[in-house]
Structure formats: C-alpha cells, structure tokens
C-alpha cells in the first residue's frame, strides 16, 4: 500500500466548486468550497463563465490541501464529479472558451427541441439515449453554440475547437491540454451517445449537427484519464483515475452496487437513482434510462432516474416566502409539535411537477385548512410532501424494474432530518439508510478514482469502507400507508 493514500475529489457543482480530501478509510479529511457567479442573459437562460469554473476549482483544490495540512505530492489520485449536461466550447490550442458555458437549467433551446419533435425525431432519440427530448440535455446546447457563436462552426470543422461537459473541460485544463476525454455517465447525458453501444452515435450526431471530432473520447469511469501538468500548486504527474456525473457519483458513493439498490439525494429538488444492473430498463412512465457507470473490463451498469423539482426548496419557501420559520433547520422541531397534519395537504409544485407526473405548468397547493390549522400543520405537511413525492418516483421505478426495492439510501442536506427520514421509510414501505458521510457525491468520485488507482482493489473493499449512521425501519402498517397515499393522490388531482 502506498504511503500517500489521500484522494482528492473535485466536486464541480452548479453554484460552487468544491474539493474534498478523502483518506483510505473513506473519511473526510478536509473540504473547501468556492462559489462563482451565475449569469442570466435573458429570462430562462443560464450561463457560467468557464474561467470562473476553472478558477474556483483550482482555488478549492489549493484550500483543501491547506486545510488538510498536506502537500500536493501526498495525493495518490484525483477523481472528478460534476454538474451534468452543462456544456462548453473552447479553442483547441489556447483552451480559451469561445462562449460562456450553457448550464443544464438553461431553456434557450426549447424551440430546437420542438422542431425536432415536429420532425418526428423524438422516438429515435429516446430509443438510443434513454432520455426525453428536452433542452436540459447537452445536444441542443452544442447545436446552439455551433450556430450562434461567431466562427464556432468553422473552427469545429477545421479541428480548432473542442466541446465537452464540465468534466472534460476540467480534465483538459488539469492535464494542460493533453487529455480530451469523458466517462460514460457524463456522455450518457449529452443525448449524443448511444447508451447501448457506449459510443457517440452517427444518427444522433447527424440529427443535432455535431461533428464527432470536437467531442471527447468516451472511457470507463475508473480509467487512466491523464496526469496533472503545469498547475503550480501541485506536482506534475498525479493521475486522474475517476470521472463520474454527480448523481451517478452519489449512487456509487452510497455503494449501491447491486440491482435494485437505490439512493435519494435531498437537495433543492430530490434526485432518485435505481441501479438496474446490466439491463437498460426502458421506462413506461417517462423516467430516464441512463448509464450509472462502467468499470474497466466490465459490462455497463445502468440506472433509472427520476427527480422532483422542489424538495428542500419547499422548506426554504416556508422560511423566505411565508416566514413560518427562522432557518431551514427549524422545520423538524416545528413539525414535531403536532402528531399529524390534521387534514392539511401541501403539494409543492412551486415550479411544476417533475417525475413521474411531468406537469411543468402545475402550481403549488395547500388544502384542507380549517380554523384549527397552524403553522406546525403546514410544516409537517411540507415534510410529508417531500417524502410522498419521492414515493411516487420509487413506486414507478419498482414497476419499471419489475421487482421490489432493497431499501433506500439517502444523502443531501435534508437527510439529516430524522422525522423526514422516518416518514420516507413509512411511506415507501422500505427501510431508509443514512450513511455517516452525507457528502456522497464527492465520496463517489473518490471511490471511483481510488478503484482506478488501486487504493481499493474491488467493490467489496469499498463496501467495507462505507459506514451507516442510522437505519430508519418501517413502523407504519400497510393499511395506514395505503390510506395516506390515497389522500396524497387526491391532493395531486386538485393541482
């Protein structure tokens, strides 16, 4: 075993870049975060400056090393996880961005998607990618950049421009332009990769008008992606051996390695992924079929993905919009002052309904109010709604997979809320497991890189490193669960 078994996990997110130093025991040694600017040029448009992404990433790397009180030479390997779908175009020689990055939230390509739907392209796109035709994914974003950025199409044609998701841009920068690669999980979100072959698809490239030459090489998630060069604060030659998209990284960080394992990340929204093993399960309910990861010399591992638009954001709204609580963490104590909601239901469709309903025009609803209703009832109804909308997604996943869940592993900020976690277990009828380390996205990148570099020799060794904080066992009877889910379904019908 190497003396220096520290792993650096870069977690490049939507609002900040973060670096975690993880030790061989899977423990968090140090963490540093650097926020960066959000750019909104027009309503519905969201951009990031690629130089901000790169600067904030470097700064978080330096700060994490300082906090850990270690030198860059003590890093055994680097793993990268990142906001998915966000895409950029840069000069192949200088590395200078040709335009701001177009962020996953950006809706500017809605018209391009509608045009493709009218031209009957949706069926072939979904069959090859497992995705729904939507501006969320990278393909129409790259198409927009090539059409609208001066000289971009010519530079692309002449081999003078490169395109990629955030992971491939960071890799290119970390290796001083020597490596233009991505992993299967990130590539599966571009809408340009065939998830059944694991490579860029000729038909899709033609549909979106993207030349293959500008795209990175697709690799297994624990590949030898390249080595550091020219960073200054770290020596040259440190290997980068893990890349995985953020939600897939959380699935891996939760050691959801078996078919039927699932994780739920409680963030602004909630993200649920279910490991479907070697089979790309086609959803009958508009869930996304995606690649979880591919390990070297192994078959692809697939997943089903669904998300609710509003999760923690509902609690923020109670705080900022209604003024019911002073800080988000107060919601649990307030909700505990009552035994139930006393008939109050809250459907938090504040920005529409996500999976499995897909009603972007839907708006939020609080119903069942009486003179006896208090802010505590509304607080409790909010927590119940957060759990119930996840149940809708989990039940849909079970139907698509054709087998019962093996339990749910949870992470993200709201996973620290014991009352919410017990509700989640009761309403989905499966035990909920919370790990000691809730930063599972960074941990997933560290596990992947460690696997690639030989810090851990296999998935069994990684499983031994993963530690449980608490398991929430089902307490609710099947009859009570059925009645509660019926009341929720009735509230949804009123939205």
UniProtKB/Swiss-Prot annotation:
Positions annotated to bind glycerol: 84-85, 136, 246-247
Record's catalysed reaction(s): glycerol + ATP = sn-glycerol 3-phosphate + ADP + H(+)
E.C. numbers: 2.7.1.30
Protein's UniProt keywords contain Flavoprotein: no
Binding site for sn-glycerol 3-phosphate: 14, 84-85, 136, 246
Keywords: ATP-binding, Glycerol metabolism, Kinase, Nucleotide-binding, Transferase
Record-listed ATP binding positions: 14-16, 268, 312, 316, 413
Residues involved in ADP binding: 14, 18, 268, 312, 413, 417
Activity regulation, free text: Inhibited by fructose 1,6-bisphosphate (FBP).
Biological processes annotated in GO: glycerol catabolic process; glycerol metabolic process; glycerol-3-phosphate metabolic process
CDD domains in UniProt: FGGY_EcGK_like
Biological or metabolic pathway of the protein: Polyol metabolism; glycerol degradation via glycerol kinase pathway; sn-glycerol 3-phosphate from glycerol: step 1/1
Listed PANTHER family: GLYCEROL KINASE, SUGAR KINASE
Family: Belongs to the FGGY kinase family.
Name under which the protein is recorded: Glycerol kinase
Provenance organism: Bdellovibrio bacteriovorus (strain ATCC 15356 / DSM 50701 / NCIMB 9529 / HD100)
């Amino acid at each position: 075993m190497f003396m220096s078994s520290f792993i650096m996990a870069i977690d490049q997110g939507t609002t900040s870049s973060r670096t975690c130093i993880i030790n061989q025991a899977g423990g968090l040694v140090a963490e540093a975060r650097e926020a960066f600017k959000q750019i909104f040029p027009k309503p519905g448009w969201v951009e990031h400056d690629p130089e901000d992404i790169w600067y904030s990433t470097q700064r978080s790397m330096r700060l994490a090393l300082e906090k850990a009180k270690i030198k860059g030479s003590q890093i055994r390997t680097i793993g990268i996880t990142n906001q998915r779908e966000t895409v950029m175009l840069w000069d192949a020689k200088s590395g200078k961005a040709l335009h701001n990055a177009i962020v996953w939230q950006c809706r500017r390509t809605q018209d391009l998607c509608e045009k493709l739907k009218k031209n009957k392209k949706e069926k072939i796109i979904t069959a090859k990618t497992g995705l729904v035709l939507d501006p969320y994914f990278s393909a129409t974003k790259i198409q927009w950049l090539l059409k609208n950025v001066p000289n971009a199409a010519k530079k692309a044609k002449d081999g003078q421009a490169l395109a990629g998701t955030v992971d491939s841009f960071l890799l290119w920068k970390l290796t001083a332009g020597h490596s233009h690669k991505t992993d299967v999980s990130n590539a599966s979100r571009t809408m340009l990769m065939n998830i059944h072959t694991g490579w860029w698809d000729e038909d899709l490239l033609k549909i979106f008008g993207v030349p293959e030459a500008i795209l990175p090489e697709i690799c297994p998630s624990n590949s030898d992606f390249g080595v550091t060069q020219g960073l200054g604060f770290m020596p040259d030659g440190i290997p980068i051996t893990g890349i995985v998209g953020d939600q897939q990284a959380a699935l891996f960080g939760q050691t959801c390695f078996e078919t039927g394992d699932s994780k739920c990340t409680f963030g602004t929204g909630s993200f649920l992924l279910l490991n479907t093993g070697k089979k790309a399960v086609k959803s009958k309910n508009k869930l996304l079929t995606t690649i979880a990861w591919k390990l070297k010399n192994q078959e692809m591992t697939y997943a089903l993905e669904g998300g609710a638009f509003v999760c923690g954001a509902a609690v923020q709204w109670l705080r900022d919009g209604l003024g019911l609580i002073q800080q988000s963490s107060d919601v649990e104590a307030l909700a505990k002052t009552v035994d139930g909601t006393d008939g109050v239901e809250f459907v938090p469709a504040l920005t529409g309904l996500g999976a499995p309903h897909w009603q972007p025009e839907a708006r939020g609803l609080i119903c069942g109010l009486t003179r006896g209703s208090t802010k505590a009832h509304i607080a409790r109804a909010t927590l119940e709604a957060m759990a119930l909308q996840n149940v809708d997604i989990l039940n849909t996943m079970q139907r698509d997979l054709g087998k019962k869940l093996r339990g749910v592993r949870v992470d993200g900020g709201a996973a620290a809320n014991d009352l919410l976690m017990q509700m989640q277990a009761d309403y989905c009828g499966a035990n909920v497991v919370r790990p000691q380390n809730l930063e599972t996205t960074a941990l997933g990148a560290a596990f992947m890189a460690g696997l690639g570099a030989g810090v851990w020799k296999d998935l069994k060794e990684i499983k031994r490193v993963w530690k449980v904080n608490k398991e929430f066992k089902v307490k609710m009877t099947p009859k009570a669960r059925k009645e509660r889910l019926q009341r929720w379904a009735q509230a949804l019908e009123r939205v």
